[in-house]
Amino acid sequence: QEDDTPAEKRYRVQTGAYRNWAYAENLLRRLQSQNFPAYILLEDGLYKVQVGAYRKLDNAVQMEKTLRDQGYSTFLAM
């Protein structure tokens, strides 16, 4: 039987959104080479490069700060 409960909301840190896969992949590889848990999400025709999926807002905020300290542009997504 399928679980009909809504998916648990997670906080994610977005570092880029591109129409071009190659640009997104380049950023993904750079983040992963620095051991960030990055991935690409295709949404609304954009390849969104995001890091993490946190239950707690505080954890996402800490990751956002870490990424900004490394020079990445970021914002929190849900």
Where does each model-flagged region fall?
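Extracytoplasmic
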Residues: 2-10, 19-78
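Conserved beta3-strand ATP-binding lysine motif
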Residues: 16
